[in-house]
Amino acid sequence: MVEEIMKSEEQKLIDVNKHRGVRSDGEEDEQLEEGEIVGGDADTLSSSSSSRPGTAIAQHPLEHSWTFWFDTPSAKSKQVAWGSSMRPIYTFSSVEEFWSLYNNIHRPSKLAQGADFYCFKNKIEPKWEDPVCANGGKWTMTFTKAKSDTCWLYTLLAMIGEQFDHGDDICGAVVNVRARQEKIALWTKNAANESAQLSIGKQWKEFIDYNDTIGFIFHEDAKTLDRSAKNKYTV
C-alpha cells in the first residue's frame, strides 16, 4: 500500500512541483533553512496550484488532517520552557497536499543537528501536556546518522494512509536529529492499552522493514524519570 501511494501520486504532482522550485530529481533549486518551504508561506502553498490554469489536481482527502511542526535547534537554545520554540508549519488534508509539502521540505538527513520535525493529527500538539497525549506513550526506532529518510517517509505514509489496525490510537510521529544518530518515535494516546500498543509496534516494524527490537515508554514515566525511564513493552 505504501508503494502504491508513492507511485500513484508522484506523477500527479510533477507540474505543481516544477513551479515550486523542485526539480524532477527531487532536489530544491535553492538552499532552504531547516523546515522552510519553497515559495514562502503556507498561503502561497495552499493557493499556488489553483492560481495557474491547467495545474488543478483532483484531491484525494485523507481521513484526518495532519500538521507538520518544527523545533529548530537555534530557537531551543534560547527558550524559557520546553516546547516554546515549537511551531506549526502547515496543515494538510489530502494526498496531494501531503506530497506538495513533503517535496518542498528538507529530509531528516538535511536538517541541522538538534532539530525535531513532527507530523501530528491536526489539533493535537506534540507535547506531553496535550490532553490527547497525556496518558499515552511512544515507540522509538534508532538509526545511524543520515539513515532515517526512507523510514521517516514510510512512517508518514502508514500514518496518513490509515494502515494501522489501531490508527485511532496514534497521535503522530517525530524525527529527532542528533549528533551521532537519528530517532523516529511514534506517539500514541492510550499507553495502558497493551494489546493496541503491541499491535502498533509490530505493524510499524513491518511497514518499514525494521528488524531491531523497539521499546515503548509511557510519557508519564518519561516526565518523572527522564532518561531512567524503562520500556514497558517491546516488540
Swiss-Prot record:
The subcellular location is: Nucleus; Cytoplasm
- Compositional bias segments (type: Basic and acidic residues): 16-25
Q: Which UniProt keywords apply?
A: Cytoplasm, Disulfide bond, Host-virus interaction, Initiation factor, Nucleus, Plant defense, Protein biosynthesis, RNA-binding, Translation regulation
State the organism of origin: Lactuca sativa
**Listed transmembrane segments:** none
* InterPro entries in the record: TIF_eIF4e-like (IPR023398), TIF_eIF_4E (IPR001040), TIF_eIF_4E_CS (IPR019770)
Q: Which family does it belong to?
A: Belongs to the eukaryotic initiation factor 4E family.
Domain of life (superkingdom): Eukaryota
| One GO BP annotation of this record | translational initiation
Q: What does this protein do?
A: Component of the protein complex eIF4F, which is involved in the recognition of the mRNA cap, ATP-dependent unwinding of 5'-terminal secondary structure and recruitment of mRNA to the ribosome. Recognizes and binds the 7-methylguanosine-containing mRNA cap during an early step in the initiation of protein synthesis and facilitates ribosome binding by inducing the unwinding of the mRNAs secondary structures. Key component of recessive resistance to potyviruses. (Microbial infection) Susceptibility host factor required for viral infection by recruiting viral RNAs to the host ribosomal complex via an interaction with viral genome-linked protein (VPg).
Question: Partners and quaternary state?
Answer: EIF4F is a multi-subunit complex, the composition of which varies with external and internal environmental conditions. It is composed of at least EIF4A, EIF4E and EIF4G. EIF4E is also known to interact with other partners. In higher plants two isoforms of EIF4F have been identified, named isoform EIF4F and isoform EIF(iso)4F. Isoform EIF4F has subunits p220 and p26, whereas isoform EIF(iso)4F has subunits p82 and p28.
Q: Any miscellaneous information on file?
A: Displayed sequence is from cv. Salinas, cv. Fiona, cv. Girelle, cv. Jessy, cv. Vanguard, cv. Mariska, cv. Trocadero and cv. 87-20M, allele Ls-eIF4E(0), and is associated with susceptibility to lettuce mosaic virus (LMV).
An example of a Pfam family matching this protein is IF4E
Q: Region EIF4G-binding: start and end of each range?
A: 60-63, 70-106, 154-163
Where does the record place the region Disordered? 16-56
Residues that bind mRNA, according to the entry? 78-83, 110, 128-129, 178-183, 223-227
PROSITE patterns associated with the record? IF4E (PS00813)
Q: State whether keyword Disulfide bond applies.
A: yes
Please note every region of biased composition (Acidic residues).
Answer: 26-36
List cystine links. Answer: C133-C171
Q: What is its main location?
A: nucleus
The family database entries (PANTHER family) matched by this protein are listed as: EUKARYOTIC TRANSLATION INITIATION FACTOR 4E RELATED, EUKARYOTIC TRANSLATION INITIATION FACTOR 4E1-RELATED
Alphabetical GO CC annotations of the entry are: cytoplasm; nucleus
PTM notes: According to the redox status, the Cys-133-Cys-171 disulfide bridge may have a role in regulating protein function by affecting its ability to bind capped mRNA.
Q: Which GO terms describe its molecular function?
A: RNA binding; translation initiation factor activity
**What name does this protein carry?**
Eukaryotic translation initiation factor 4E-1
